[in-house]
Amino acid sequence: MSFWNTRRILVTGGAGFLGSVIVEKLKEKGCKTISVPRSKDYDLVDNDACKRIYQETKPDIVIHLAAKVGGIGANRNNPGKFFYDNAMMGIQMMEQGRVFGIEKFVALGTICAYPKFTPVPFKEANLWDGYPEETNAPYGLAKKMLLVQAQAYKQQYDFNAIYLLPVNLYGPRDNFDLETSHVIPAIIRKCLESQNSTIETEREINSAQVAISESQSCITIWGTGNPTREFLYVEDAADGIILATEKYNKTDPVNLGSGFEISIKDLVKLIVKLTNFKGKVVWDTSKPDGQPRRRLDTTKAEKEFGFKAKTRLEAGLMQTIEWYMKNKATVVC
């Protein structure tokens, strides 16, 4: 009998980007009872809603994915909201899980929880060696508190909670809203939408400055392009989380990543090639770069529960681009 056959699973954020993939994979594994709460029915910032969700769904295992997330701009403009909502959702859901007596709580952290100048590759032991990059610090610290809570609850209550640290995810169903999206969906959308855009430029004609309209594609990317990032394809991330849920029962945090680091400049070049974008890329150096480098040491995940990412970046990007082109009418905001 499968680990999943008889267990009742609650997946917060289960209708979202990562959550929907996890739910599909759980069904494939034979899980018969999966609850996916919707935000319109359960505001997880409200403790009474957290209590009600346990009473109504009666889960054995909770995979807590619900989060307030966004790119640099969204984090910079809403630091209080990102801190409060993420802290309250996670802390209350874990506490009510303890009170309800669930078998296991799976908490997702974030690479943003690591110190700004962590030695590369990031090892789990480095997590407390400094303050996070300032732009993402409120979000990163809020998620980091779930690790503290998991370890404290194990010590005092013998409560089984694990804490996973994924890198930035990408793939089909990602958030392509330019106000809140992460770097990969934002660049893909900009490249595809700018192919035939018309912009106003100034050109000197007969010694006079006049504004004319010309067909010219141009995309603007924040920062210098020098920082490096690591990305994990959403299908791989879902596999890692499911494996950890089955096999990992320690309170030590575990990284989930691909082990592949790429500069933002090289990432843009790759997406430009894959989207066949022929226009100009402008780097807005007045905007923040964020953390200088990000790459995880993923040896613990492989050792503890056999996880290793399978999808190469270019292949994953191509699948993401193809999905967006087929679905942009329904996902573009």
Model-derived features: positions:
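C-terminal substrate-binding subdomain of Rossmann-fold SDR/epimerase-dehydratase oxidoreductases
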Residues: 17, 23-29, 193-333
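Adenosine-cofactor binding site in Rossmann-like domains, unifying the SAM/SAH pocket
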Residues: 27, 32-52
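Flexible, glycine-rich beta-alpha linker
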Residues: 43, 113-115, 138, 162-183, ...
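Active-site Tyr-X1-5-Lys
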Residues: 134-167, 186-197
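NAD(P)H cofactor-binding loop motif with strongest signal on the N-terminal glycine-rich segment
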Residues: 14
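NAD(P)H-binding glycine-rich loop region in Rossmannoid oxidoreductase-like domains
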Residues: 48-86, 96
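Short-chain dehydrogenase/reductase
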Residues: 83, 87, 135-147, 177-182, ...
